[in-house]
Structure formats: C-alpha cells, structure tokens
C-alpha cells in the first residue's frame, strides 16, 4: 500500500515538472510558446514629467534638452485640446518613451444642464473668457424675474422673458440665440476657441438657465491647431539642431 502511494506521489511530481516546462514551437515562420514569457533584459523607461501648462513643456524642451540625446528624434503629440505629450520616436523595441505629459486644467461648467440663477451667473463669470455675447447673457440672466401669470414665450427658435430695466419698470426681452462664447476648454497659453451655444431659460417656478453646445465639437480641431501654432513658435526660437529633431503632430 505504501509502495503504491509512493509511486502515485512520484507520478504527481513528474507531472508538475512537465507542466513547468515551456514548449516553444515554430508554425508558418512564427514562434509560439505555451506559456506567457517575460523578458529580463527590457529597456528601462523614465516616468514622464507631469504638468498642467504648455509653458512648462516649453521650458522642459529648452532647458532639459540633454535628456534626449542628439541622435534621438522626438515627437510632440497634441492628443486633444487638454493633453500634450513629448515622446521619443520608435526605439529598437518598437516602443516610444514618454518624457513629458501636460494636462490642462479647464472649465468645470456643465453644458446642457440647468442652473439656478445665482449658480449660472457665477459659472459664467468663472469659466468663460469675456465676449460681447457673454455680457449680453449675463445682463439678461441677472435681470430675469419670475412671471406669476405668464410662462416664458418660446417658439423653438427664440424665447421672450421679462427682465427689469429700472427700479420698478419691466420689459419683455428676446433671449439672444445662438450666442458665441469662449469657455475655458484648453490651455491658458492659447486663445480659447469660440463656439456657438443655444441659451435656454426654464420656467419651473423660479428662473433657471442652461447652455447647449450647437456646433458638434468643431472647436476641438481649432484648439489643437492653436496648440500646435504655440509650440511651433516656441521651437522657431531655438537653434536649428533642436528644431530638426522635434516633430509636432496633432
């Protein structure tokens, strides 16, 4: 009985050893293994420097150029209106090393959501660059008052609301639509793209307001172009050797 148990344990050990073996086969010119393998001689890549501004990236390129050697080409990738990366060209491992990454701190304004009067006024002043249309919206929203017997007039294209025009006088005012505004949606170093928004006034007991984007995200393309223009200007002020090593894409 003990002899049989010993043989069984030896058989289990043998199966375990067989299972630990890695089998490598070649099929149609491609090499495969029956286990996931991990290389021990992989290249070491640096952790990217993190920032929130384009000027920080510009400072890094100008002042830390020794971190990317002269024989190493670099790419500035404008990923989106809020993210830019500085990375190397493909290395021998067919990988790219990201040296710098910057993420813009942008407006927290919630489009297509209702705001009460005070929150709307604060949100506009904190999250939008000044424009004539912004002043018009602020003026109207700040002077709207509740109607007791009449709802806001709305024909689908324009709205009419009562606003105060003096100490006690009131007048009907046409709500401007669409309005052209510049919310803070990309890096502060570039001009904020202008976009069209539909300005709506709600009538659920107290005045409420919202802005609805009305151009399908066209501003993103403009923002990326402005970021590229800014970075190209930075590079144009550097020596030819540095300019020739860096490509900007976006």
Feature-to-residue mapping (PLM):
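Charged, low-complexity surface segments at secondary-structure and domain boundaries
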Residues: 39-46, 104-109, 126, 212-217
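Long, compositionally biased interface segments
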Residues: 190-250
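Amphipathic, membrane-active segments
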Residues: 46, 50-109, 150-208
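Membrane-inserting effector segments that mediate pore formation, membrane fusion
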Residues: 110-160
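Generic N-terminal initiation segments characterized by hydrophobic and/or small/turn-forming residues
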Residues: 2, 6, 51-54, 71, ...
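Alpha-helix boundary/N-cap detector
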Residues: 3, 48, 52, 111-115, ...
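Surface-exposed polar/charged interaction patches
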Residues: 15-18, 43, 60-67, 126-131, ...
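An N-terminally focused, membrane-permeabilizing/fusogenic/translocator signature enriched
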Residues: 1-85, 241-250
């Amino acid at each position: 009985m003990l002899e049989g148990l010993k043989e069984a344990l030896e058989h289990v050990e043998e199966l375990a050893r067989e299972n630990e073996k890695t089998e490598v086969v070649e099929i149609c010119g491609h090499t495969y293994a029956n286990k996931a393998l991990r290389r021990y001689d992989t290249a070491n890549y640096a952790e990217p420097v993190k920032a929130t501004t384009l000027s920080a990236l510009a400072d890094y390129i100008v002042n830390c150029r020794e971190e990317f050697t002269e024989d190493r080409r670099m790419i500035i990738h404008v990923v989106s209106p809020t993210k830019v990366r500085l990375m190397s060209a493909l290395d021998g491992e067919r990988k790219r090393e990201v040296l710098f990454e910057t993420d813009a701190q942008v407006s927290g304004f919630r489009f297509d959501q209702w705001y009460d009067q005070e929150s709307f006024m604060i949100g506009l002043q904190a999250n939008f660059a000044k424009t004539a249309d912004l002043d018009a919206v602020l003026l109207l929203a700040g002077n709207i008052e509740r109607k007791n017997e009449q709802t806001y007039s709305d024909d689908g294209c324009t709205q009419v609301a009562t606003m105060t025009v003096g100490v006690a006088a009131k007048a009907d005012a046409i709500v401007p639509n669409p309005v052209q505004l510049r919310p803070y949606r990309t890096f502060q170093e570039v001009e904020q793209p202008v976009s069209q928004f539909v300005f709506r006034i709600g009538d659920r007991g107290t005045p409420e307001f919202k802005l609805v984007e009305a151009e399908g995200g066209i501003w993103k393309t403009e923002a990326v172009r402005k970021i590229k223009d800014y970075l190209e200007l930075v590079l144009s002020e550097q020596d030819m050797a540095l300019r020739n090593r860096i490509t900007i894409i976006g």
